[in-house]
């Protein structure tokens, strides 16, 4: 378990350091220890272990006692006593034991899958929190610039250098940005509540404003990890379970055995000894073997379908990840050669560009900054979805 947690943390948060890594590590540990859904899943796993062992033992023995009064009394009284144990055919217990082990293994896989989804959700909330922190910082800077521009334009109005239209434009821009800022604050609060819920009610403070570096992907290695992952194992073990249930159905159709001790006493005469019996398999388990064989065929088809769908989905997600990375690279390259908002504001204040040009250009620049942050967020969320197989 400890080794798995270390792998989770390394793969999930691998390329960040310092306080950011500590915050991420704290969140994941809290989720593993305090998350309510995981607590329920652990208890469900224990219940499944106990359920898997039910019905794997022989039936209870039967004890008989009879006291019969004789008539006429000269015959004396008759006392009968017997102990009988019925057993299924021996191979049935072998197959029941195998079925039990497979069910326990599947219960563990189901817990691991639940843990995967919970840790993935925690990872995605962490990424979203960083994204919202970045948006808050970006909007704060943008608001400061808009406030400066509005003040500058109002001074120009007093000096008669601009008209009311320019003042209205500057005020409209400021009001629009204030609305966006309030929306981001609301989203931050919603995300904070979601983080508290997923960490079992514990307050989690995430102030990160830097995304972790993307983890390099090796498609063949990732595909193999999915083929050996919990979902794939669950399907393969489902097939194994149906095969063992088929073998068990065959064993249950074989004769049942009965052995016991019996005694009969009348006056001074007593008979004691053992008795054996065997059932005649006729109609009690009719069609159960045919049904079990049909279920095996169904499970084989389900494994084949899942394997194909899983490979296709992984390849599609890898392609989507590659597309997002290209978008990020293009925008980052474009921003490297673009004028910053502070330079635009300086140019406007010095009369190098008009107020309308500043509004259009700065808004275009700002919207693309937001788009870049969204691309980076989507990239990391897609990456987290792909890497959940290692959780």
Where are these regions (language model features)?
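Charged, solvent-exposed structural "stalk/scaffold" segments
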Residues: 23, 134-183, 197, 326-378, ...
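Bacterial Sec-dependent N-terminal signal peptides
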Residues: 1-26, 32, 391
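Surface positions of alpha-helical coiled-coils, especially the charged/polar e/g heptad sites
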Residues: 23, 30, 37, 89, ...
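Sec/SRP-type N-terminal targeting helices
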Residues: 39-43, 56, 88-118, 165, ...
